[in-house]
Amino acid sequence: MGFFSGAADTMGPMPPDENRRSPRILLVTGNPNKLEEARRILGSRLEAVDLDLPEIQSLDLLEVLRAKGWEAYRRVGRPLVVEETGFEIDAFGGFPGPLVKWMLEAMGPEGMARAALAVGEREGSGAGAVARGMVLYVDGERELVGEGVARGTLVVPPRGEGGFGWDPVFLPEGLSGRARTYGELAGAEKDRIGHRGQAWRDLAAK
């Protein structure tokens, strides 16, 4: 996949001359935070397009991703990338997964974390959670999927002003030094261990 050539080995934007030679790829998102994270890894060749796409209600993250990706391609007719994220909470048996957006809208990140911690304490399932990210490239003839997984625990009260979504209540594993939530991490460090950074690098390597 030529437009991602070399991106798997870098955590910063590609050189300007390479950006000029490479075709621009659409990232389907209306979220500027997601575009910023992707550009930190793959460079400015990504440009955002905001489409109002139907979201199928499924606990299968790949099924949701593929439905979204091919519908987006049908509408714009250009090579593009779509992203989906699931948040699997141990105390809820892996729920909400891809439906986390609706739980966050209903409860907020702190409410979600407090509910999970209460159930986990009562049932002995703990405070663990898995952040799972998938990105899909579609060009009309083929699809390529990148996946990233970050294991961690939920914490309250929220910590940190960075990030978005559940970032301030998710304490990822794999950090050196003091434990910090996604919301407390600088961009490059979050990219290194986070589920989205892993997923983008996995896609870039294909």
Describe every region a protein language model picked out.
Residues 15-26, 33-206:
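Anionic-ligand binding patches
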Residues 3-4:
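Aromatic (phenylalanine/tyrosine) cluster motif
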Residues 8-9, 40:
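Intrinsic disorder/low-complexity segments in short proteins, especially the signal peptide
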Residues 9-10, 18:
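Short, positively charged and aromatic/hydrophobic N-terminal segments
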